[in-house]
A protein has these predicted regions:
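Signal peptide-proximal N-terminal region
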Residues: 26, 50-72, 188-193
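Extracellular/periplasmic periplasmic-binding protein-like sensory domains
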Residues: 242-317, 327-333, 384-415, 419-420
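Solvent-exposed, acidic/polar segments of extracytosolic/periplasmic ligand-binding ectodomains
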Residues: 29, 346-427
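Extracellular/periplasmic Venus flytrap/periplasmic-binding protein
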Residues: 86, 130-131, 137-246, 285-293, ...
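Periplasmic-binding protein-like
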Residues: 91-103, 124-126, 164-169, 222-233, ...
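Extracytoplasmic "Venus flytrap"
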Residues: 32-51, 75-82, 104-107, 171-176, ...
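Beta-alpha junction/loop-to-helix N-cap segments that form part of ligand/metal-binding clefts
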Residues: 43-50, 63-132, 141, 200-209
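Gram-negative bacterial Sec-dependent N-terminal signal peptides
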Residues: 1-24
């Protein structure tokens, strides 16, 4: 009798223990962090991992979300593009995360995207990209081309009188598509083929001598020349060093970069870079109270007052706060409900004002041009008068000029053809 009773008691105790574990597991809301912590993109992405950890920590200090603590789950896709898809699946299926913040390169995003669509999860992508995409499961808080590349070219043309153009990029989808858009845009402005030079290099490229020599020659033929750079990752370090080595100053041939910010400059000798430009939607030097508080919080969290902030960090900050607001409004972390609740959410950005999530899953943001200073910071030399709405499909490519995106129900289409009146999907 006692033996049978003890057996039942043991079974009951085990059941309670297992049940308790289930309750505890469901007691947190899991946030996936999918940024490269090793490989060629670690120079840029490691900081974004730390940014999300800071935001999770701050939210937990406010009481968490829906009465639960947030739990960050960090993985390292190691700058290996197929591994991004594997790690995304691991986060969603095995770790049961409710949202993922991750990616930098477009090839990493393209690798992950089918996984998020298959499993109907949510990805916040915080980096400027080439556009030509709108997915139900991705929220793009970085700049589309009309929020960075096009305004930068306008600035060079209108303010600096640039007539010849070097479009230099890393050899993958973001630079190639962005430069395709820019080439079409430049030609629409009357720039001829002979005044456009296009060059691509692999990730991690280190020998820039002959390429920079070609750029120097191209810029010495009588017309004011600029380089529009979509070079990504650690290849930027030897690129700028070679510019300095060949005596190319910002007055001779200015470079405007779309993937060089404070983080990349923090590890470089900036003496040869002074006066060159970058186009972003945020700089650490922005003079607002919100930015001052963000920088202070960052230094406190990272325990290093020398660490910088940059544009993708702000995009992560905006995306995280949008997600928190949408989950709060929806009263659940259910992906379908949160996707619907995100449209129309407006949160403060760090440049002043509010950024809004649009039906095409892009946001409104200001556009800033900054000039590199000798301390690795940027002096803001130009900015848009208001916020610019992100455009998923470029007006300057014939195949996409007729496409329109809205995920608002009942429309729910990422690529609606206004001529055929048919939806052709999202990307």
């Amino acid at each position: 009798m006692n033996k049978a009773f003890n057996t039942k008691l043991a079974v009951l105790s085990l059941a309670l223990t297992l049940g308790s574990g289930v309750v505890q597991a469901a007691d947190t809301i899991k946030v996936g962090v999918l940024h490269s912590l090793s490989g060629t993109m670690a120079i840029s992405e490691t900081t974004l991992k730390d940014t999300v950890l800071m935001l999770v920590d701050e939210q937990n200090k406010k009481g968490g979300l829906l009465g639960k603590k947030l739990e960050a789950v960090v993985v390292d896709p190691a700058s290996n593009w197929p591994l991004f898809a594997e790690k995304a699946r691991e986060l969603i299926e095995k770790e049961k995360v409710d949202v993922v913040f991750g990616g930098w390169t477009s090839v990493s995003r393209k690798s992950m995207l089918p996984v998020f669509e298959e499993l109907n999860s949510i990805l916040f992508y915080p980096v400027q990209y080439e556009g030509e995409e709108s997915s139900k499961n991705v929220f793009y808080t970085g700049a589309a081309p009309n929020q960075q590349a096009i305004p930068a070219v306008d600035y060079l043309m209108d303010e600096l009188g640039i007539e010849r153009w070097v479009l230099a990029g890393t050899d993958y989808v973001y630079p190639r598509t962005t430069n395709k858009i820019l080439e079409a845009y430049l030609k629409s402005k009357g720039v001829s083929d002979k005044d456009i030079m296009i060059n691509y290099t692999p990730f991690g490229h280190s020998d820039w001598q002959s390429i920079v020599s070609d750029v120097k020659k191209f810029g010495s033929e009588g017309k004011k020349t600029a380089v529009v750079s979509t070079i990504n990752g650690d290849a930027n370090v030897p690129f700028y060093k070679e510019l300095g080595a060949q005596g190319i100053s910002s007055e001779d041939i200015p470079v405007v970069a779309f993937s060089v910010g404070e983080e990349e400059l923090s590890g470089m000798d900036t003496s040869a870079l002074v006066g060159h430009l970058a186009a972003w939607n945020y700089f650490m030097s922005v003079d607002t109270q919100a930015n001052e508080e963000f920088v202070e919080a960052w230094h406190k969290f990272i325990k290093d007052d020398k660490r910088v902030t940059n544009d993708p960090m702000e995009a992560s900050y905006i995306g995280f706060n949008m997600w928190v607001q949408a989950v709060t409004n929806a009263g659940t972390t259910d992906p379908e409900a949160v996707q619907d609740a995100l449209i129309g959410v407006a949160v403060p950005n760090l440049s002043g004002g509010y950024s809004t999530m649009l039906p095409n899953h892009h946001i409104t943001k200001p556009v800033l041009i900054g000039e590199i200073q000798d301390d690795g910071q940027f002096d803001i030399v130009w900015e848009t008068k208001g916020l610019v709405a992100g455009d998923a499909w470029s007006d300057f490519l014939p195949e996409s000029a007729k496409l329109f995106s809205s995920w608002s129900k009942p429309f729910s289409c990422g690529a609606f053809n206004v001529e055929t009146k048919k939806c052709s999907g999202g990307n």
